[in-house]
Every structure is written in C-alpha cells, then in structure tokens.
Amino acid sequence: MPKMKTKSSAKKRFKITASGKVKVAAAGKRHGMIKRSNKFIRDARGTMVLSDQDAKKVIQYYLPNGF
C-alpha cells in the first residue's frame, strides 16, 4: 500500500511543534469584527494550541508525514 499523502490544505493551516503539539490560528477573524468585543479580538490574536484529542486526529488523518 502506498504511503499516505499530506493534505495540502492542512499544511497551510497547522504547524507541529517540536514537542508534538499542533498550533493553529484562531477562527472567526475574517470579517465582521466591528460587532465583536475587544476581549474577543484580543483573544483571537495570534495562534492557539489544539487539544490532545484534536491534535491526534489532525496528525493521523491530515499530516501523516509530520509537516
């Protein structure tokens, strides 16, 4: 059976840290920010780390080669 390919869309959205955690940008920031609270805008800045369960699934299905 051939080796699984990495999903190209996942390469652009997820980064795996040296310790094996998965970093991702916070969602909900494309438009409509005028009605959001300052706390939401501040908390959505930068990146966040996925939970262990979600990270396991992302690596297993979308990033099998560890991109």
UniProtKB/Swiss-Prot annotation:
SUPFAM superfamilies: L35p-like (SSF143034)
Listed GO MF terms: structural constituent of ribosome
PANTHER family per the UniProt record, alphabetical: 54S RIBOSOMAL PROTEIN BL35M (PTHR33343), LARGE RIBOSOMAL SUBUNIT PROTEIN BL35M (PTHR33343:SF1)
Keywords of this entry: Ribonucleoprotein, Ribosomal protein
GO biological process, one term: translation
Source species: Bartonella quintana (strain Toulouse)
PROSITE patterns named in the record: RIBOSOMAL_L35
Name of the protein described by the UniProt record: Large ribosomal subunit protein bL35
Family: Belongs to the bacterial ribosomal protein bL35 family.
Stored InterPro entries: Ribosomal_bL35, Ribosomal_bL35-like, Ribosomal_bL35_CS, Ribosomal_bL35_sf
Lineage top rank: taxon: Bacteria
CC terms in the record's Gene Ontology section: cytosolic large ribosomal subunit
